[in-house]
């Protein structure tokens, strides 16, 4: 009875050892095939197709010979490697192989679907095939990217103003930035008499500025170049002409005011039945007579010379364009 039990246990142990060896051999074969496939993929990436030469044929023979020798040596070493590989490593290798096979199948299906779609889309149109989404994304980014030396762009939706700002010239905003609302036309016509009365003190500053400029021009110690001297002369002439204009305007106002006052006094005293208000032509004559009376002899001669030249110019124009009746 004891001998029968010993034989039974020996047979069971032999069966279990045979099963474990079979599992080891199957898993080892899977691992070997996985390693060989990876090696072939890397070699396929590095080896490129070309024309067949003698050197290529010899290299292919060497490659096949080396692969055969490797297979033989691996077959001899399989039994030794089975004992060193664990179940965990074999399970991980098997999971990776199954995952890789499923990924390859999905990629092949996607490639077939994209090829079918491209075929049907290209058959309808004569143009080039459409680019992928990634290429479209890159193309959009290239379009959005601008060169810093590119000309400036403006929106076509906004209407163009009639008066445009020219680079290098003062813009309209700068000109109208600091405007005095007291002289704005939107508030009505300005009262020159009141303005002149309120800002009469500015004449003192203008006179002081004229005297300073004349002193700068007379002083020989000031090392002024020709451009600076010419600019000061122009400013001095502008100030003098402005002062003369203001004086003439004040004189006209005083003459008309005095004439009006005299007429009202005569009317109140009974010398005249009705006051006489001057017409525009009469005003001009009265102002001209008063100006000549207030002028110095040299100024009067210059004014007479200007009037004579002006009158001669008008006469020459009339003679030049007179029609010939002969």
From Swiss-Prot:
It comes from Candida tropicalis (strain ATCC MYA-3404 / T1). Residues 290-304 have a biased composition (Basic and acidic residues). Associates with 90S and pre-40S pre-ribosomal particles. The keyword Hydrolase does not apply. Keywords: Coiled coil, Nucleus, Ribonucleoprotein, Ribosome biogenesis, rRNA processing. Belongs to the RRP36 family. Residues 51-178, 288-326 are annotated as: Disordered. This is rRNA biogenesis protein RRP36. The lineage of its organism: Eukaryota, Fungi, Dikarya, Ascomycota, Saccharomycotina. One of its GO terms (cellular component) is nucleolus. Pfam families: RRP36. The gene is RRP36. One of its GO terms (biological process) is maturation of SSU-rRNA from tricistronic rRNA transcript (SSU-rRNA, 5.8S rRNA, LSU-rRNA). InterPro entries: RRP36. Component of the 90S pre-ribosome involved in the maturation of rRNAs. Required for early cleavages of the pre-RNAs in the 40S ribosomal subunit maturation pathway. Residues 52-63, 103-129 have a biased composition (Acidic residues). It is found in: Nucleus, Nucleolus. Residues 207-250 form a coiled coil.
């Amino acid at each position: 009875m004891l001998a029968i039990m010993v034989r039974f246990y020996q047979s069971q142990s032999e069966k279990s050892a045979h099963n474990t060896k079979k599992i080891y051999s199957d898993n080892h074969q899977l691992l070997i095939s996985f390693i060989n496939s990876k090696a072939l993929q890397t070699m396929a990436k590095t080896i490129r197709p070309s024309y067949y030469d003698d050197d290529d044929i010899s290299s292919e023979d060497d490659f096949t010979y080396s692969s055969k020798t490797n297979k033989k040596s691996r077959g001899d070493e399989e039994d030794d490697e089975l004992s060193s590989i664990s179940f965990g490593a074999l399970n991980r290798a098997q999971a990776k192989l199954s995952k890789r096979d499923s990924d390859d199948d999905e990629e092949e299906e996607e490639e077939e679907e994209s090829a079918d779609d491209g075929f049907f889309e290209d058959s309808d149109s004569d143009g080039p095939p459409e680019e992928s989404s990634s290429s479209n994304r890159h193309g959009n980014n290239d379009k959005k990217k601008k060169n810093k030396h590119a000309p400036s762009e403006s929106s076509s939706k906004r209407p163009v103003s009639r008066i445009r700002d020219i680079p290098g010239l003062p813009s309209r905003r700068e000109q109208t930035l600091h405007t005095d609302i007291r002289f704005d036309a939107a508030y009505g016509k300005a009262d020159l008499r009141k303005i002149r009365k309120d800002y009469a003190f500015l004449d003192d500053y203008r006179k002081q500025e004229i005297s300073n400029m004349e002193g700068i021009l007379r002083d020989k110690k000031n090392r002024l170049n020709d451009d600076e001297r010419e600019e000061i002369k122009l400013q001095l002439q502008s100030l003098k002409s402005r002062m003369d204009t203001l004086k003439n305007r004040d004189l006209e106002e005083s003459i008309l005011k005095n004439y009006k006052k005299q007429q009202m006094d005569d009317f109140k005293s009974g010398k005249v039945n009705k006051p006489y208000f001057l017409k525009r032509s009469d005003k001009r004559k009265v102002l001209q007579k008063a100006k000549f009376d207030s002028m110095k002899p040299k100024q009067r001669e210059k004014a007479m010379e200007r009037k004579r030249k002006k009158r001669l110019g008008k006469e020459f124009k009339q003679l030049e364009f007179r029609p010939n009746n002969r």
